[in-house]
């Protein structure tokens, strides 16, 4: 009798509150919608996902094959193979003049896991994370899962999508625990220069309780100058986490391997956390990553050169397009135009109104998949990936131009004013 199940008047809800309140990634949602339309026979040009369209360099593939033949088929240390972590230590010293130990390096299943490891290891409920906008789409969800609060610092196309040191200082409160940003930036392509990082560092040195998390996954896709990092600023190396990975610079998105270099206390906490989630990363991917870090960089440079050419092509193809305000990106492989002057245009009987409706308009009328800037903390913008062929870029931009021109012809709104 006592084992009888209790009666429920409503259907059971198995999803946790944590997940129920979490928003789906808009980039992945648009990519899925684009694929579904393609499967239905529509000719969609998908500019929604940030994934290099190049093959993984041959020497990296060969290293993976050799690892299989050498039977690298066992569990690895949670933090990654020792020689791989030492390769990162060498890279940090050579590229950033930053001396770290192998114990400060942790490899994870993609830079995304590296980031969530750090946030979950450091943040407590109610902590505040300073988030310069635009920001990568997953940052806010990660902060939410860590039960912290995102404090968004807006920027504009006029500022090159960068925030000033004054804006940074004004946002700091006694609850501020972390500053999280990417450079080169996804989605804007903005690259923080040494003097800009120095200005931020001057503010942060007044607030020693703030940890800096620098997402440098686009390190190798930079069109001008050398790579700069917060760890190069005086007084910041011991309170900065650098997150990087193999996906973007080596065309290894499917290999799922990223890493964090952190203060020892943070790195140790991340190892403890990861040990309860995924344990170690793929052994074969780690051997491939070692070849990537120690091998020649000419394939990476070739990819970067191609992305620069594609950027120039996309900018040229959208030149003088009414209502299209797009700073020239200095890195990554995206355009991030402000398209807010189109919000008043009438489509399907009502104003476009917001960036999400603009992406719907472009998908339906131009058959081009883009992502709303709402997902990146910039609701007046849309993001377009240029990680595709020159022919696709030309065709996509031609379709976008034609769709907007047709919209102009059906509206009394003067977009050129």
Each language-model region and where it sits:
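PLP-dependent class I/II
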Residues: 1-15, 19-25, 30-33, 37-44, ...
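A glycine-/small-polar-enriched, mobile loop at the entrance of the PLP active site in fold-type I
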Residues: 48-51, 66-84
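Conserved N-terminal alpha-helix of the aminotransferase class I/II PLP-enzyme fold
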Residues: 75-108
């Amino acid at each position: 009798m006592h084992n009888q199940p209790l009666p429920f008047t409503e259907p059971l809800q198995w999803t946790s509150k944590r997940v129920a309140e979490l928003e789906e990634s808009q980039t992945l949602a648009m990519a899925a919608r684009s694929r579904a339309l393609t499967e239905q026979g529509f000719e969609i040009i998908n500019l929604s996902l940030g994934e290099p369209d190049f093959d993984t360099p041959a020497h990296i593939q060969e290293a993976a094959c050799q690892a299989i033949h050498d039977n690298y088929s066992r569990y690895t240390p949670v933090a990654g193979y020792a020689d791989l972590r030492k390769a990162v230590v060498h890279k940090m010293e050579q590229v950033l003049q930053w001396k770290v130990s192998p114990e400060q390096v942790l490899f994870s299943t993609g830079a995304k896991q590296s980031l969530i490891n750090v946030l979950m290891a450091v943040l407590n409920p109610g902590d505040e994370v300073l988030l310069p906008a635009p920001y990568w789409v997953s940052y806010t969800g990660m902060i939410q899962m860590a039960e912290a609060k995102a404090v968004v610092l807006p920027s504009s196309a006029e500022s090159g999508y960068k925030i000033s040191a004054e804006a940074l200082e004004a946002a700091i409160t006694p609850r501020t625990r972390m500053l999280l940003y990417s450079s080169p930036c996804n989605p804007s392509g903005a690259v923080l220069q040494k003097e800009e990082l120095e200005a931020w560092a001057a503010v942060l040195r007044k607030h020693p309780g703030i940890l800096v998390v620098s997402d440098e996954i686009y390190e190798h896709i930079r069109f001008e100058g050398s790579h700069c990092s917060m760890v190069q600023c005086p007084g910041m190396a011991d309170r900065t986490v650098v997150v990087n990975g193999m996906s973007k610079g080596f065309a290894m998105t499917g290999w799922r391997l990223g890493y964090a270099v952190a203060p020892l206390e943070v790195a140790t906490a991340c190892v403890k956390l990861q040990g309860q989630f995924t344990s170690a990363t793929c052994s074969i991917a780690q051997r491939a990553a070692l070849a990537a870090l120690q091998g020649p960089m000419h394939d990476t440079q070739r990819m970067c050169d191609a992305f620069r050419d594609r950027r120039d092509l996309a900018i040229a193809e959208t030149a003088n397009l009414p209502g299209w305000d797009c700073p020239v990106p200095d890195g990554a492989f995206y355009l991030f135009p402000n398209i807010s002057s189109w919000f008043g245009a009438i489509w399907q009987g009502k104003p476009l109104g917001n960036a999400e409706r603009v992406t719907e308009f472009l998908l339906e009328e131009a058959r081009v998949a883009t992502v709303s800037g709402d997902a990146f903390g910039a609701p007046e913008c849309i993001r377009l990936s240029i990680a595709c062929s020159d022919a696709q870029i030309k065709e996509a931009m031609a379709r976008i131009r034609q769709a907007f021109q047709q919209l102009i012809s059906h509206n009394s709104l003067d977009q050129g004013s």
